[in-house]
Amino acid sequence: MGVALGAGLAVSIAGIGGGIGMGIAGGKAFEAIARQPEVGGDVRTLLFITLAFIETLTIYGLLIAFMLVGKA
């Protein structure tokens, strides 16, 4: 039971943290584009790269959950 609880916590905390991080990053990027529309393309490119890194951390949480369940 402890392994299942740990796996669930790993996925949920990683997912919640990733979702909050993506929301904050997206909001700030849109604020920057609204303030200076001429740099919209550059900001959008950096936003997509940042979102990919955030999603990678979320996938690591899922990987840890699979590793925990695999040991049980």
From Swiss-Prot:
Family matches, as InterPro entries: ATP_synth_csu_bac/chlpt (IPR005953), ATP_synth_F0_csu (IPR000454), ATP_synth_F0_csu_DDCD_BS (IPR020537), ATP_synth_F0_csu_sf (IPR038662), ATPase_proteolipid_c-like_dom (IPR002379), F/V-ATP_Csub_sf (IPR035921)
Transmembrane regions listed in the UniProt entry: 4-24, 46-66
Major subcellular location class: membrane
Keywords: ATP synthesis, Cell membrane, CF(0), Hydrogen ion transport, Ion transport, Lipid-binding, Membrane, Transmembrane, Transmembrane helix, Transport
UniProt cross-references to Gene3D superfamilies, sorted A to Z: F1F0 ATP synthase subunit C (1.20.20.10)
Compartment annotation: Cell membrane
A GO term from the CC aspect: plasma membrane
Site feature location: Reversibly protonated during proton transport: E55
GO molecular function (one): lipid binding
Keyword Thylakoid: no
Membrane topology (UniProt): Multi-pass membrane protein
Pfam families in the record: ATP-synt_C
Subunit structure: F-type ATPases have 2 components, F(1) - the catalytic core - and F(0) - the membrane proton channel. F(1) has five subunits: alpha(3), beta(3), gamma(1), delta(1), epsilon(1). F(0) has three main subunits: a(1), b(2) and c(10-14). The alpha and beta chains form an alternating ring which encloses part of the gamma chain. F(1) is attached to F(0) by a central stalk formed by the gamma and epsilon chains, while a peripheral stalk is formed by the delta and b chains.
Protein purpose: F(1)F(0) ATP synthase produces ATP from ADP in the presence of a proton or sodium gradient. F-type ATPases consist of two structural domains, F(1) containing the extramembraneous catalytic core and F(0) containing the membrane proton channel, linked together by a central stalk and a peripheral stalk. During catalysis, ATP synthesis in the catalytic domain of F(1) is coupled via a rotary mechanism of the central stalk subunits to proton translocation.
Family classification: Belongs to the ATPase C chain family.
This protein's name: ATP synthase subunit c
Source species: Syntrophomonas wolfei subsp. wolfei (strain DSM 2245B / Goettingen)
Organismal lineage: Bacteria, Bacillati, Bacillota, Clostridia, Eubacteriales
Gene name as annotated: atpE
